[in-house]
Amino acid sequence: MSDGQLPTRERILETSLRLFSQKGYLGATTKEISAESGVAEVTLFRHFPTKESLFQEVLSTYTFLPTLKGIMPAVEVMPYEKALAEIARRFIETLRLRRDLIKIMHSECHLYPEKIKSIQHSFLAEMLSILADFFASRRKKGNLKTFDEFLAARLFLGMFYQYFITSEVIGLKILANYDDDSVIEGYVNIFSRGTRK
């Protein structure tokens, strides 16, 4: 389906993702988003009452959060290490797809108004909470040691986020001799040894 055939809401979201990725939240205007979406600015505001709500919907639609929610039913029945590897693989894939958005958000996040910082924090907290619930569920089944599941979720995603940032955003080739599968396998092995009973 071409952009012109997409429903208005989806067209606005796709255009917003593209412009936020190119110009950042601060640089992209609702006037520009509506024009490039082929709608009047008033139409944009009918779908998204504020620029903040539009940004929140872009994060909710195009980041790892919907992917994580979608894979959890399958991941919850996988063996532990396989489940961790699947989460990591999908996380890295999503980060690569959204590389430009991540780069621009890193460069301007210190300038964001509190409302936008709050949106980012709630999105990250929900993602970490889902993963923490996964660890808690596995612990209740007797598979894992007792540990702070929220910190473990942050550590787990943080390892792979740092791998992505150093290699894809900063351009350091510290792990140049490793492909994604090797990094995922190595990180998961280390992480699972620290958390498994």
Task: Give names to the regions the model predicted.
Residues G38-F48:
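Short hydrophobic/aromatic patch on the recognition helix
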Residues M1-K23, G27-V39, S53:
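Basic, helix-initiating cap at the start of DNA-binding domains
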Residues L13, E81, A85-R89, L128-A136, ...:
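An amphipathic alpha-helix signature
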Residues K117, R139-Y187:
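Hydrophobic/aromatic-rich alpha-helical bundle segments in the mid-to-C-terminal region
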Residues R9-E10, T30, E52, V77, ...:
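Short, structured helix-loop boundary elements
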Residues S60-T63, K82-S107, L157-F164, R193, ...:
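Helical hydrophobic small-molecule/effector-binding pocket
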Residues Q56-I87, I130, A136-R139:
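Amphipathic alpha-helical linker/stalk segments
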Residues R96-I130, N177:
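Short secondary-structure transition hinges
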